[in-house]
């Protein structure tokens, strides 16, 4: 044993591929798409395609944020109603306890 109790305890860098793999790693070399860099040589089609892809992703993110906002708003309303309901139940239980105390003679009628 070389003195390490846990993997990674020896301060050696663990490659990230041990924890996850990307879609590009799963594709064979022949089917992988080449990475396109934004240079002056790029034609308009490639730039338009990249912009539309970016636009789609941004639209998806904003849609998800809107859904999250609606969900949080709905949860806030439900929580408010539950808090009011709990307060109403507490008041009803107190009045019931007073009524029982009066009827059993533990407390004088007020």
Swiss-Prot record:
Q: Which UniProt keywords apply?
A: Coiled coil, Disulfide bond, Phosphoprotein, Virion
Q: What Pfam family does this protein match (any one)?
A: Vac_Fusion
The protein's superkingdom reads Viruses
> Does the entry feature the keyword Coiled coil, yes or no?
yes
Q: Which GO terms describe its biological process?
A: fusion of virus membrane with host plasma membrane
Q: Where in the cell is it found?
A: Virion
**Sorted alphabetically, which InterPro entries does this protein's record hold?**
Chordopox_Fusion/A27
Keyword flag tRNA processing: no
**A cellular-component GO term for this protein:** viral envelope
Assembly with partners or alone:
Homohexamers, covalently linked. Interacts with OPG144 and OPG153.
User: To which protein family does this belong?
Assistant: Belongs to the orthopoxvirus OPG154 protein family.
Entry function: Structural protein involved in the envelopment of mature virion (MV) to form the wrapped virion (WV). The wrapping consists of the addition of Golgi membranes to the mature virion. Participates in mature virion (MV) movement within the infected cell. May play an indirect role in MV-cell fusion.
Q: What is this protein called?
A: Protein OPG154
The record lists the organism as Vaccinia virus (strain Copenhagen)
């Amino acid at each position: 044993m070389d003195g390490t109790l846990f993997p990674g305890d020896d301060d050696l860098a663990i490659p990230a591929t041990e924890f996850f793999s990307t879609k590009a790693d799963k594709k064979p070399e022949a089917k992988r798409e080449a990475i396109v860099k934004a240079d002056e040589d790029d034609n308009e089609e490639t730039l338009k395609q990249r912009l539309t892809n970016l636009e789609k992703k941004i639209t998806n993110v904003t849609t998800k944020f809107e859904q999250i906002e609606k969900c949080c708003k709905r949860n806030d309303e439900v929580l408010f109603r539950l808090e009011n309901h709990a307060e109403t139940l507490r008041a009803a239980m107190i009045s019931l306890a007073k009524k029982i105390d009066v009827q059993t003679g533990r407390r004088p009628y007020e």
